[in-house]
Design a protein with these regions (language model features):
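N-terminal secretory signal peptides that target proteins for export/translocation
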Residues: 1-16
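Negatively charged
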Residues: 24, 30-206
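Sec-dependent signal peptide recognition
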Residues: 16-25
Length: 206
């Protein structure tokens, strides 16, 4: 019987290479998942479908869709809307949400999934939006400095009967809250956990 000799060095190299390839592909999968969970790192404004099927939008995209009451942005033949429960626009790159729904008396759609983590201004965002009453307690306004007039005269707003306490310490950078809920006659939620330690103006807040 012929003796079979095994090149142990070559075998070890092959096994090592195989294991390294496996580790590489596993790392690639983990990295891609992490990126998919953080849309701001996976694409640019206008990219579609790269993050959980959402369209990455900027302020102008939102303004145009709101202005014509379609609440829809078209990209590559696909309609991305926040006028229903599709949840398919990503807002995490937007810093300025000022006046977006000001005076929009017909808007009451679920935008609680919006990412406002980079926002610095929510000033007058729902000012006079008399129909709006959606739950936005999952928002994290940790960089927001201006919430003045945010819900002024938003007469239906009560956060869909959900607490806004989760904003808690995320309000610590807010400087302006004047007239924030002025004329928001339905609002009656607990905000006792808020920590606006840097606030400068709170006059006529309610």
């Amino acid at each position: 019987m012929k003796e079979i000799k095994i090149n142990k060095k070559a075998l070890n190299i092959s096994i090592t290479n195989y294991l390294l390839r496996g580790i590489f592909f596993l790392a690639l999968i983990v990295t891609n998942k992490a990126k998919a969970d953080n849309c701001s790192k996976i694409g640019q404004i206008g990219d579609s479908g790269v993050c959980n099927g959402m369209l990455i939008v900027d302020r102008e995209d939102l303004k145009n869709a709101i202005a014509d009451d379609s609440y829809t942005i078209q990209k590559d033949g696909v309609n991305y809307t926040f006028g229903d429960d599709s949840n398919n626009v990503y807002t995490g790159n937007i810093k300025n949400f000022t006046n977006l729904f000001k005076g929009k008396t017909n808007f009451n759609e679920d935008i609680g999934y919006w990412d406002i983590s980079k926002a610095t201004s929510l000033r007058q965002m729902f000012d006079g939006a008399t129909l709006f009453n959606q739950d936005i307690s999952n928002w994290r306004p940790s960089k927001v400095k201006n919430m003045a007039f945010m819900f002024r005269n938003a007469t239906s707003f009560n956060n869909n009967s959900q607490s806004l306490n989760d904003w808690g310490e995320h309000t610590s950078k807010v400087e302006f809250m004047q007239s924030m809920f002025f004329g928001a006659t339905s609002f009656n939620q607990d905000i006792g956990n808020w920590r606006p330690t840097n606030v400068k103006r709170m006059n006529s807040m309610f």
